[in-house]
Curated annotation (Swiss-Prot):
Reaction catalysis annotation: Hydrolyzes Xaa-Pro-|- bonds to release unblocked, N-terminal dipeptides from substrates including Ala-Pro-|-p-nitroanilide and (sequentially) Tyr-Pro-|-Phe-Pro-|-Gly-Pro-|-Ile
Protein name: Xaa-Pro dipeptidyl-peptidase
Organism: Streptococcus thermophilus (strain CNRZ 1066)
Enzyme category, top tier: hydrolase
Record key words, sorted: Aminopeptidase, Cytoplasm, Hydrolase, Protease, Serine protease
Residues in coiled coil: none
Function: Removes N-terminal dipeptides sequentially from polypeptides having unsubstituted N-termini provided that the penultimate residue is proline.
Family according to the record: Belongs to the peptidase S15 family.
Length: 755
């Protein structure tokens, strides 16, 4: 374990004293460091009447138990403090460590001992081996009572709300859209978990089309075949118009108003970051949206109709939209329990809706936590004029996702009433996505949130993984860079895949969100400042660093070679079939120079930290009137790399007081032969830009530029890079087995590493 503490807020000795005393620690500004430490440690043993016995079972140094130390006249030293602090944090001498000084240094222990109360204050805010901070562990053990009111420590809310006596209610919010065109504004189901209190509370809202269930069997039937010809597209320019996202004014006329919801629920799937804050006084709201189980409308999949329907829930929390107690629309109900302040949460589609909601500039949305979210749907399903499936899902497209999330059809009565109209709508959508050509068009433009980044007012927190080939890093990169310069924004850029990071051992992400939520939603003047970019170092285990930005302008140029080389697109049928059935076998062969590719190896002559988009400038020609080029950059070398999927450790992370416990996780640091750094794909007809389609003349040289997926990746002098240039990618692109070649003039081609 390593400590990476970004949530602690430095305080004055007076504040440290006041907060420690308020929690029942009998410390004094006049007492010695040793006396205060003894009082602190004795308080830790909440379940012991005889704390002497507990102290006797701990040690102050290899020769002295802790009780004997406190009874002696020896002063408290950094060594004793450190050894006892380790035991307080759950580490066991002679098991987890033998040399406490070396162990503390290896773990980057964040507290510099000076004997002050600030040391004890920071120790409470430090994570234990279980993943909980020491103060959260003690509160879960009833250090302070459940009060159903806010208690803050170090600018963060503690788990003082009763999660056994929550309000669990359902309302149906009236949206400003009629997506199924039945003449009625669509209602969306809102599932609410909130503390049982008599004062207004803020809310964490998760907009998830998956929340009420999915229609996987129907979606699987629509999965597209990836085998086919790369078509020649007519040359020309693509024209677009700016989407209109203005909603009509809401009708706020009450109808037989009531103050109590009539629908309850026993269980719903939740996000543990929401659970963590629910125990700390923030309501948790889940909204599936239009076209989902027990909501109305059709699934419009990423357009601003879908977004405005989610926005209506935030409007309802602020008195600007109506909600009904049931879909019969007989009684309206107001959110009289809500303060109106909201943060959105969730990963993938959920993070996508966070991005989209932020661009509406809706009042009340104070903060957005967008985890691995899409910022432009074209960049999820397409790339540079090509069909490019999200990693791990070849053959998926927006029509299959629409079918997957249209859970309204799981209700047989709804299926009976609406399926015919829905299928007509889905057929139209399937045409609009244009799988034939892979070009950007108005359909995709209507689902590009980046163009409205200037409307964002909320504080934005992003998380994204360098190994996320599902929602690829271009999505966070372009949104992060497009936001107004005056806006407060933050990015946690880790080395995982498409994964949550709130339960990781190495970083206090949820505590950082607690501090920020208290500041933005509860109005707590805690002085908390979160760095702009927090990056997980790819060369070390559990190591995080602060960076100034994502994307740098400096570039190191690497000439690709001195000759020409060719890529054969065609495979023998047996190999082509094998790769199509198991794309991982293609990747294995590709990276080991066993597939159709140009493989180029380079040894770095300097240390470099890639930060941004690796750029390829290639001089190429195709033997036919079409073609595509794919590229991947890898670090080669048999050594330890961070694996992309977090491994569970133990079921030790508590989100309240024995509430919604979950497994602690971390990216394993494992031996491997290589690590993919970045990748990219380009249709040669889109070599100029995304909106320009040009002819490809057979055997005529072209200069193309290809920006690969953005990343942050550290390399040392002597490290070996491998650039692989190829055509068909069996995981991502159309599988065209035509017999043509792409030739690259390596002497006129280069790779630029941004740093």
């Amino acid at each position: 374990m390593k400590f990476n503490q970004f949530s602690y807020i430095p305080v004055s000795p007076e504040t440290a004293y006041q907060e420690l005393r308020s929690l029942g620690f009998e410390v004094s500004l006049d007492a010695s460091a040793k006396a205060n430490f003894e009082s602190f440690v004795r308080k830790y043993f909440l379940f012991f009447e005889d704390t002497d016995l507990a102290l006797k079972n701990w040690i102050a140094d290899p020769e002295t138990d802790l009780l004997s130390f406190f009874q002696s006249d020896r002063p408290l030293t950094a060594e004793v403090f450190g050894l006892v602090a380790l035991q307080l944090l759950g580490f066991v001498p002679n098991v987890d460590f033998t040399d406490s000084v070396a162990f503390l240094e290896k773990m980057a222990f964040p507290i510099a001992f000076d004997g002050s109360l600030n040391n004890l204050h920071q120790l409470l805010a430090t994570r234990t081996q279980s993943g909980n901070t020491l103060i959260d562990q003690l509160v879960a053990q009833d250090l302070i009572p459940i009060s159903n009111d806010y208690v803050f420590f170090n600018g963060k809310s503690l788990a003082t709300f009763d999660t056994n006596q929550l309000h669990r209610e359902v309302v149906y919010v009236e949206t400003p859209v009629d997506t199924d065109k039945d003449g009625l504004l669509d209602l969306v189901k809102v599932t609410i978990l909130r503390p049982n209190v008599d004062f207004p509370v803020p809310a964490m809202m998760t907009a998830s089309p998956y929340q009420q269930g999915t229609n996987e069997p129907s979606s699987d039937k629509l999965t597209h075949k990836m085998e086919g010809d790369l078509l020649v597209k007519p040359a020309g320019k693509i024209s677009l118009s700016r989407p209109e996202i203005k909603a009509p004014e809401a009708d706020l006329t009450p109808i037989n108003p009531v103050t109590k919801a009539e629908e309850r629920f026993a269980h719903t799937d939740t996000y543990t970051l929401n659970d963590y804050m629910l125990a700390r006084g923030v309501a948790s709201i889940y909204v599936s949206g239009v076209g989902t189980f027990n909501s109305e409308g059709f699934m419009t999949s990423g357009d601003y109709q879908q977004v405005l329907a989610y926005k209506a829930v935030i409007d309802w929390l602020n008195g600007r939209a109506r909600a009904f107690t049931s879909r019969s629309r007989q009684h309206t109900i107001t959110a009289d329990w809500a303060s109106g302040k909201v943060t959105t949460t969730g990963l993938s589609y959920l993070g996508t809706m966070s991005n989209a909601l932020a661009t509406t500039g809706v009042d009340g949305l104070e903060m957005v936590i967008a985890e691995a979210g899409i910022s432009s749907w074209y960049d999820y399903y397409r790339e540079n004029g090509l069909l490019v499936s999200p990693g791990g899902y070849p053959g998926e497209d927006l029509d299959t996702l629409t079918e997957f999330t249209y859970s309204r059809a799981l209700l047989a009565g709804e299926y009976l009433r609406h399926q015919k109209d829905y299928e007509a709508y889905l057929n139209e959508l399937s045409t609009d996505i244009d799988r034939k050509h892979g070009d950007y068009n108005q359909f995709w433009h209507d689902r590009n949130y980046v163009q409205f980044a200037d409307r964002v007012k909320a504080t934005v927190v992003f998380t994204h993984g360098s190994q996320d080939w599902n929602v690829k890093p271009i999505n966070v990169y372009q949104m992060f860079r497009a936001l107004p310069k005056s806006l407060e924004k933050h990015l946690f850029f880790h080395n995982g895949a498409h994964v949550y990071m709130n339960a990781w051992q190495s970083i206090d992400f949820r505590e950082s969100m607690n501090a920020l939520i208290c500041q933005k939603l509860l109005g707590l003047d805690n002085g908390y400042t979160l760095p702009t970019v927090i990056w997980q170092n790819n060369q070390s285990e559990q190591t995080w660093e602060v960076l100034d930005n994502f994307g740098h302008d400096n570039g190191k140029h690497i000439q690709l070679g001195k000759s020409e080389a060719s890529i054969a697109n065609h495979y023998e049928e047996e190999i082509f079939a094998k790769y199509g059935k198991a794309y991982q076998s293609f990747k294995d062969d590709l990276f080991m120079d066993k597939a159709n590719a140009i493989t180029l190896d380079f040894e770095l002559d300097q240390d470099i930290q890639i930060n941004g988009r690796v750029h390829l400038e290639l001089r190429v020609k195709s033997s036919t009137n079409r073609g595509l080029i794919s590229a991947q950059v890898l670090e080669m070398g048999d050594k330890k790399y961070l694996a992309p999927i977090p491994a569970p450790k133990r079921m030790s992370l508590d989100n309240g007081r024995l509430f919604k416990e979950e497994a602690l996780r971390e990216l394993p640091f494992k031996q491997a032969k290589y690590r993919v750094i970045t990748k990219g794909h380009l249709n040669l007809q889109n070599r100029k830009d995304l909106l320009s389609i040009e002819n490809v003349t057979p055997n005529e040289w072209m200069t193309i530029g290809l920006d690969l997926q953005p990343t942050i990746y550290k390399l040392n002098k002597g490290d070996k890079l491998r650039l692989v240039l190829y055509t068909t990618d069996f995981e991502h692109t159309i599988r065209d087995n035509s017999d043509y070649e792409v030739t690259v003039d390596l002497s006129q081609s280069k790779m630029t590493l941004p740093y």
